[in-house]
């Protein structure tokens, strides 16, 4: 900020040099050449202390204060306590045309120049008019530098005005030249001998050639009211002398060159609307760069070729050069960190990361992380097993838990070279080996040749690898342990551990996709089980449990078989038959209308007392109870009482269900009806049965079960005595494999059956016991020729 900017188009002071000061001193007044009505232009510089807003008062504040009205300079002031300071302001007057009157002439010929120093609220005494006695009545703070008429012979174009003012008992030299006002501390020799500046207030004009001077240095004449400026409306506490001098220096100079006194030199920023002051010159220069940088001025450029960075200060350039030299003088003090930085600012930014290290803490290992993202990435390392096997293909960074998973992934890199494609309609999978395609085709055909040989298991699989993986359950090979402390769970498969690990996160990421269902689960298996509830439509069920006392439905045969093994304890031999029984004829289509005459309890009792053939009895019981095999009770009741024709080729019974043998309903004429339903004790003579004309009934994978035709060796049945036995010669039986079209290995082995009539018992009348044999399908067909007899109570039929 230059003072000429505040005083634009200012006139030049005209005055001559030389001449003395007359004793009587004349008043300075307007020259005759001045235009009428023209008054000097007023400029106000208002220094203020820190208590009033700082030493650098904005220029717009000063201009606002200059426009306000105020009391007269010499108006009476209220008395203030001693020691209080006064605010003050200086008025700069632009010179106007005219000449200063010469010495001895009593007339002013030249411009009028007035500089007023107005006292603050601390003025004392009553002032009215001129004070011949000097400034003593006005107090120590009266400041005045009023040029008086002086004889000037030849005023020059570059004349200067100088004077001395006292501010808070400190004398300052005042110089006004070419429109520029300068204040400076006077040298020691400039003071008069014996003067006491702190005790003698005065208004002093230093003598200088060419300028009018006051006759009495102490005079403070009354000024015209039109030259008085407004006074600050509200009085403020008096600033200290040093602070007031600093404020004055900040207001009066762009660089604040105010002399060598301590605390006086201040440097004011010249930028508009800035007003900041600085105690040292280099501080002002540094501050000016902030204004120039906003205008694109960055004078400090990096000297290294190819860099091109520019900076506003040399310090920033020096700091930048450290990055080229790889110098990192600022090291992180955190223990175990070891990082260093080129600037302290980067170090502070790095230290904030250490301050936030405890914000996100892992609950498993108590390790801390600065962000939630890093904590989440760390937690996955706890809940996922180690993945030591990495893909070796270029550009692929995937890792796997097992070698088999890695091999499976590697095949994906050879998709273009695969030659074996699935020919099943709708399936376009390809494989690099024929054996893999063969395993895949089993998923379409339903073939599962790899059977688990563990006792009571019965699971089968499409490949050996799946079977070996399944056997881990039987061996209790739980090689995948949960790493969470206190959990202790282990799993046979890695994918099971991964699914379990999600439960430790406390989240439920698996959401039911059914519209309107908001169920959420922490494990995928739980979601799978839940999803079945939405499929409980009757039309979607495919299989029903074959056990008559169970009404459960299943969507697949596999789930039905699992249910039978776990819930009904069905053996694997029956499960093997059920798995292959895809074309069994429903028993409801084969039974007669009189099927319900026998209850389930009576059917179970038929197979309850089988000595040494428990598995066979359980098998047949399950078949009967499941509804696969049924018995026509009415036909059984009349089996042995039917009429045998003369050709001895009567059927024992009609083939209804495979194990049931029916006879004709007409009882033989030679036998008493009471033999079967009464109390008379009669019996058959010993006779033999053959299988000449046996009608075969095919039951599919269960094998061919024969309806035997009973032949009597004699034309008429002979009466039986209690000691007689009816035997069946197995040598005369024709194997069923030759009587049916489909040969089944599970065909029941023909057994030698005997009817033993116990002595001292009624054969049929008194609910006698008839014994006949059932073969054991699970036994050895070649080694066993005879079977133990089954005791049947209430009725008799032959299988």
Swiss-Prot record:
Q: Where are the zinc fingers (C2H2-type)?
A: 267-291, 300-324, 330-354, 360-382, 389-413, 420-444, 450-474, 480-504, 510-534, 543-568
The UniProt entry, under SMART domains, shows: ZnF_C2H2
UniProt-annotated stretches for the region Required for interaction with ZXDC: 267-573
Tissue/organ expression: May be expressed in brain, heart, kidney, liver, lung, muscle and placenta.
Top-level taxon of origin: Eukaryota
Q: Region labeled Required for transcriptional activation — which residues?
A: 572-699
* Compositional bias of kind Gly residues: 13-26
Q: List the disulfide bonds.
A: none
Q: Which keywords does this chain's UniProt record carry?
A: Activator, Metal-binding, Nucleus, Repeat, Transcription, Transcription regulation, Zinc, Zinc-finger
MF (Gene Ontology): C2H2 zinc finger domain binding; transcription coactivator activity; transcription coregulator activity; zinc ion binding
Membrane-spanning intervals of the chain: none
Q: Which GO terms describe its cellular component?
A: nucleus
Its subcellular locations are: Nucleus
Do the record's keywords include Repeat?
yes
* Biological-process GO terms, alphabetical: positive regulation of DNA-templated transcription; regulation of transcription by RNA polymerase II
Region entry Disordered: which residue ranges?
A: 1-89
The subunit structure is: Self-associates. Interacts with ZXDC and CIITA.
Function text: Cooperates with CIITA to promote transcription of MHC class I and MHC class II genes.
Q: Which family does it belong to?
A: Belongs to the ZXD family.
**Annotated protein name in UniProt:** Zinc finger X-linked protein ZXDA
What gene is it encoded by?
ZXDA
């Amino acid at each position: 900020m230059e003072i000429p900017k505040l005083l634009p188009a200012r006139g030049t002071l005209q005055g001559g040099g030389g001449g003395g000061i007359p004793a009587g001193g004349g008043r300075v007044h307007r020259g005759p050449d001045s235009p009428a009505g023209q008054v000097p232009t007023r400029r106000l510089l208002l220094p203020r202390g820190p208590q009033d807003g700082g030493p650098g008062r904005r220029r717009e504040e000063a201009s606002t204060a200059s426009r306000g009205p105020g009391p007269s300079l010499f108006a009476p002031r209220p008395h203030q306590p001693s020691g209080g300071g006064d605010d003050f302001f200086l008025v700069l007057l632009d010179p106007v045309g005219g000449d200063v009157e010469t010495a001895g002439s009593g007339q002013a010929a030249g411009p009028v120049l007035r500089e007023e120093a107005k006292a603050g609220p601390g003025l004392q005494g009553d002032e009215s008019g001129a004070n011949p006695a000097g400034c003593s009545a006005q107090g120590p703070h009266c400041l005045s530098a009023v040029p008086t008429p002086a004889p000037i012979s030849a005023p020059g174009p570059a004349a200067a005005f100088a004077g001395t003012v006292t501010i808070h008992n400190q004398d300052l030299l005042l110089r006004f030249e070419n429109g520029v006002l300068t204040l400076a501390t006077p040298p020691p020799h400039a003071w008069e001998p014996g003067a006491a500046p702190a005790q003698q207030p005065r208004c002093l004009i230093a003598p200088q050639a060419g300028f009018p001077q006051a006759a009495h240095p102490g005079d403070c004449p009354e000024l015209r009211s039109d030259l008085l400026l407004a006074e600050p409306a509200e009085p403020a506490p008096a600033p200290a002398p040093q602070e007031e001098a600093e404020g004055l220096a900040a207001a009066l100079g762009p660089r604040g060159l105010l002399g060598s006194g301590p605390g006086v030199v201040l440097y004011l920023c010249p930028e508009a609307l800035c007003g900041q002051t600085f105690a040292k010159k280099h501080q002002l220069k540094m501050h000016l760069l902030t204004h120039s940088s906003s205008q694109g001025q960055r004078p400090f450029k990096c000297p290294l070729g190819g860099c091109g960075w520019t900076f506003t200060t040399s310090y920033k350039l020096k700091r930048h050069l450290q990055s080229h030299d790889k110098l990192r003088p600022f090291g992180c003090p955190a223990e175990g960190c070891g990082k260093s930085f080129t600037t302290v600012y980067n170090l502070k930014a790095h230290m904030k990361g250490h301050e936030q290290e405890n914000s996100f803490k892992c609950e498993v290992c108590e390790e801390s992380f600065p962000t939630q993202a890093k904590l989440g990435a760390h937690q996955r390392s706890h809940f996922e097993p180690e993945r030591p096997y990495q893909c070796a293909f270029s550009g692929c960074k995937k890792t796997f838990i097992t070698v088999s998973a890695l091999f499976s992934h590697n095949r994906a890199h050879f998709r273009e070279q695969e030659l074996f494609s699935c020919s099943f309609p709708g399936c376009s999978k390809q494989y690099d080996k024929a054996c893999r395609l063969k395993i895949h085709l089993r998923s379409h055909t339903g073939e599962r040749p790899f059977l688990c040989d563990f006792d009571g298991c019965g699971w089968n699989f499409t490949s050996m690898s799946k079977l070996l993986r399944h056997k881990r359950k039987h061996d209790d090979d739980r090689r995948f342990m949960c790493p969470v402390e206190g959990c202790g769970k282990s799993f046979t498969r890695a994918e099971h551990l991964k699914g379990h690990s999600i439960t430790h996160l406390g989240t439920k990421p698996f959401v039911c996709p059914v519209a309107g269902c908001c169920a959420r689960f922490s494990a995928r298996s739980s979601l799978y089980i839940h999803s079945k509830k939405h499929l409980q439509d009757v039309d979607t069920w495919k299989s029903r449990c074959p056990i008559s006392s169970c009404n459960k439905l299943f969507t697949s045969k596999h789930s039905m078989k699992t249910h039978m093994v776990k819930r009904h304890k069905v053996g694997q031999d029956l499960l093997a038959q059920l798995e292959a029984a895809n074309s069994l004829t429903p028993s409801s289509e084969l039974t007669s209308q009189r099927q319900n005459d026998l209850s389930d309890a009576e059917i179970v009792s038929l197979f309850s007392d089988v000595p040494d053939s428990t598995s066979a009895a359980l098998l047949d019981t399950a078949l009967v109870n499941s509804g696969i095999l049924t018995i026509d009770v009415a036909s059984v009741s009349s089996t042995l009482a039917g009429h045998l024709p003369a050709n001895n080729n009567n059927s024992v019974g009609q083939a209804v269900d495979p194990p049931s043998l029916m006879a004709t309903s007409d009882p033989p004429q030679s036998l008493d009806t009471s033999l079967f339903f009464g109390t008379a004790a009669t019996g058959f003579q010993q006779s033999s049965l053959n299988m000449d004309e046996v009608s075969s009934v095919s039951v599919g994978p269960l094998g061919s079960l024969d309806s035997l035709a009973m032949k009597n060796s004699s034309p008429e049945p002979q009466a039986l005595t209690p000691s007689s036995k009816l035997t069946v010669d197995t040598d005369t039986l024709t194997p069923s494999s030759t009587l049916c079209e489909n040969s089944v290995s599970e065909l029941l082995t023909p057994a030698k059956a005997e009817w033993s009539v116990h002595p001292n018992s009624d054969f049929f009348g008194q609910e006698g016991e008839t014994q006949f044999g059932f073969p054991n399908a699970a036994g050895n067909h070649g080694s066993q020729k005879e079977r133990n007899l089954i005791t049947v109570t209430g009725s008799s039929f032959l299988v």
